[in-house]
Amino acid sequence: MMRLRERHSIALMALLVALQLLLAIIAGPAALMAQGPEGEFAWPEGKRAAVSLSFDDARPSQVETGLALLDRLGAKATFYVVPVRVETRLDGWKELARSGHEIGNHSMRHPCTGNFQWSRQSALEDYTLQQMREELIEANRRIRELLGVEAVTFAYPCGQTFVGRGPATKSYVPLVAELFLAGRGWLDETPNDPAFHDPAQVTGMPMDGMDFPEVRRVVEGAREAGQWLVLAGHEFGREGPQTTRIEMLERLVPYLQDPENEVWFETVENVARYIRGQQR
């Protein structure tokens, strides 16, 4: 009698498994259709990717050359500033902020690894998280005081995200996540997947020293993958170290603005806010 019950139990289990498999086969295609293609992200107005232009350090050429160039091209960019450098061209920076460009936080002292001799007095190896917190808050206060705007995104100086040494080393990414809408890196090798990326670690890819065909290839790759490309530069000019070339921008901006290229061209803040809204 027990063996008969066991056989009935086994047969019933097999039947249930078969029914589950059949339901999965029937429902599978419909479920996949409901989910949509893997990694799909809906950019505004049917765009296929997003691109942001950003510039670091509050260098003089940004207000002396960059402001007029971007205004002529009808483009808005994000500028990550160090307050003491803003003070040297304050009228120009006030005009830039009034023009609708985003002003972001780039710290008070631009701390990087002390392996750079010029950063030895503000070496990340000698920082604590509390010191970094105080510096970032103070930089935001000074930006408000100087330019009357609130910096809601941040760019890591030198793209470096640590404080301390050895076993005491800590990441200050969590601090940036607490204080800012987004934190941008530097010298990264890929654009951002909007469905996966960490807002406190937005990748930033270089555009200094590059010509238009080089940058266009990066934009096209981001478009094919549905990504957010944040380009990062420093000086505005025609040649020189850490210089984003004027000729390149004169071709890149119209390319990004052309509806046929299906790119959403916006500031770091606006793209970051949109992605956050989509992820809720």
Predicted regions and their residues:
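Second-shell loop/turn segments in exported
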Residues: S52-S54, Q121-Q130, E239-Q242
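Catalytic domains of cell-wall/extracellular-matrix polysaccharide-remodeling enzymes
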Residues: T65, E87-T88, C112-R216, M248
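N-terminal secretory signal peptides that target proteins for export/translocation
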Residues: M1-A11
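Boundary/entry segment of secreted carbohydrate-active catalytic domains
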Residues: G36-V63
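Boundary at the C-terminal end of the N-terminal hydrophobic targeting segment
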Residues: L32-A34
